[in-house]
Curated annotation (Swiss-Prot):
Species this protein is from: Ruegeria pomeroyi (strain ATCC 700808 / DSM 15171 / DSS-3) (Silicibacter pomeroyi)
The protein's name in its UniProt record: Integration host factor subunit beta
Subunit structure, as described in the record: Heterodimer of an alpha and a beta chain.
Top-level taxonomy: Bacteria, Pseudomonadati, Pseudomonadota, Alphaproteobacteria, Rhodobacterales
Chain's role: This protein is one of the two subunits of integration host factor, a specific DNA-binding protein that functions in genetic recombination as well as in transcriptional and translational control.
Chain segments annotated as transmembrane: none
GO molecular function: DNA binding; structural constituent of chromatin
GO cellular component, one term: chromosome
Length: 94
């Protein structure tokens, strides 16, 4: 599912809301999650999961084509951990 499909589904299930309002709400949610993660905060959506940022330390890597060693800088990557309710539903337990 892509963002526009999510917006359309929410708008279809809530006919009292205009699609442009639903789009603003969805975009605001994504912006807030992104901003919180950019600050290094953890975003927890109970039952669904938690978004956080993990630090990957600098390391010595290898160029697979040439075999040369290369220095890979430290970086921060997004991480998602599923919540129990989502995990259970995906495994047919709910």
């Amino acid at each position: 599912m892509i963002r526009s499909e999510l917006i359309q589904k929410i708008a279809d299930e809530n006919p009292h809301l205009y699609q442009r309002d639903v789009e603003r709400i969805v975009n605001t949610v994504f912006e807030e999650v992104t901003d919180a993660m950019a600050r290094g905060d953890r975003v927890e959506l109970r039952g669904f999961g938690a978004f956080s940022v993990k630090k990957r330390d600098a390391r010595i890597g290898r160029n697979p084509r040439t075999g040369d060693t290369v220095h890979v800088e430290e970086k921060h990557v997004p991480f998602f951990k599923t919540g129990k309710l989502l995990r259970d539903r995906l495994n047919g337990k709910a």
